[in-house]
Amino acid sequence: IQEYHNIGRSIKRSEKYNYISGKQITDHESGTRVYEINNYRLPSVTTILGATKNQEFIKQWKAKVGEAEADRIKNHSSSRGTSMHKFLEHYILGTGYDDLTSIGQEASPMAKKIIEIGLAPVEEWYGSEVTLHYPGLYAGSTDLVCLHNGMETIVDFKQSNRPKREEWIEDYYMQIAAYAMAHDYVYGSKIQQGVIMVCTPDLYYQEFKAEGLQLRQWKHRFLKRLDMYHDLKNDEKEKANVKMKEEDFK
């Protein structure tokens, strides 16, 4: 076990799991994000959820604020989220990091708020920015796998422009449920909970958890979305009269 010291406290790293590496690439045929693991290409969890979600709310929001403003907000939020994740990743690894850009100055206090409140119960961590996959089905990258209040946990960090309501984050729950299933299948673990840590630019912190029966229910809901995704892909191939490749069935 290695021990790191950062921001006034130590975080232990455990080598309990030997994680398989994967490469994230863009599939040129579909233009979607896929993971290349053990010579297989798997759709990402975010691609699956994005392709099967109800787009009506997004359409209404774009109509309200305008296409250009919607793109500006989306790009700014994405950049801020990327920077916040970098701060958190380096904190967990125990390595120094700073971002002196205006985006970085927004993201840094948000990351510190998550460190101060969200990561306080973390006793040890197994992996940061871990590529996980369920062979033949899907893959993705989770922000943190750790021991949180005595439970093996999948953690996802999220930035948000405003506080979240439970009913707005169903895809977040399905995301951590998908990662938990993949981790358990490949590594023989028993992930007990998923924790979503959210912070806004005005430093409002929220935490959402799924464990036990609730986590199982989110797993089932993700599997339904996975079925929908494959149905959509099959329909697209039939319409295009594309012959399915052998690897589609692996």
PLM features: residue spans?
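Metal-dependent nuclease catalytic cores that hydrolyze phosphodiester bonds in DNA/RNA
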Residues: 1-139, 246, 250
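Generic alpha-helical secondary structure signal
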Residues: 8, 21-23, 39, 95, ...
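A structural signal for alpha-helix termini and helix-coil/disorder junctions
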Residues: 90-94, 120, 185, 228, ...
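Generic preference for flexible, low-structure residues
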Residues: 100, 104, 207-210, 238, ...
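Mg2+/Mn2+-dependent nuclease catalytic core
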Residues: 126-232
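Charged phosphate-binding loop/patch that engages nucleotide di/tri-phosphates or the phosphate backbone
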Residues: 221-250
